[in-house]
A protein has these predicted regions:
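Residues lining hydrophobic/aromatic ligand-binding pockets adjacent to catalytic sites
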Residues: 1-141
Length: 141
């Protein structure tokens, strides 16, 4: 991912920011959390890795998760810590995971809960309760 450059010849940043504003502008916690994401998405990052790392870092901060991000080039033993790298498969259905079952929370559209939309949906809709919702969503082995 460090080699993947971002094409700034397209206006993808403005399109994404307008899309987020359009979808979540009326969410209860939009005005509080959006200013954290806007400058990151407006900045011209040198590569996809830098953009993703900044977004991950701000999400963890907003979720009050003081997690140290360790970059590993190769898989290695990490002791007693839970290693889910092999469990996260982009093409697999997220709702089939043995370690996670989304806990319903109030959303903007419709009456039915739509799980696994995005961390933005969770933050904009429930604000400071987001960490609690995620903890409740973890399945215990």
């Amino acid at each position: 991912m460090r080699e993947v450059k971002i094409d700034y010849g397209q206006k993808w940043q403005a399109i994404h920011l307008r899309g987020i504003q359009s979808a979540y502008g009326k969410a209860p916690f939009f005005e509080y959390f959006f200013p954290y994401f806007q400058p990151i998405l407006e900045r011209q990052h040198s590569n996809l890795w830098d953009l993703n790392l900044q977004l991950l870092t701000i999400c963890l901060k907003l979720l009050r998760r003081p997690v140290k991000i360790t970059v590993l080039e190769n898989k290695e033993t990490i002791g007693e810590k839970v290693d889910l790298r092999g469990q996260i498969v982009p093409k697999g259905a997220f709702y089939n995971r043995s370690y996670y079952q989304a806990t319903p929370y109030p959303q903007l559209f419709g009456l039915d809960f739509e799980p696994n939309l995005s961390i933005l949906d969770l933050l904009f809709c429930v604000g400071p309760e987001a960490e609690k919702v995620l903890k409740q969503s973890l399945k215990k082995p």
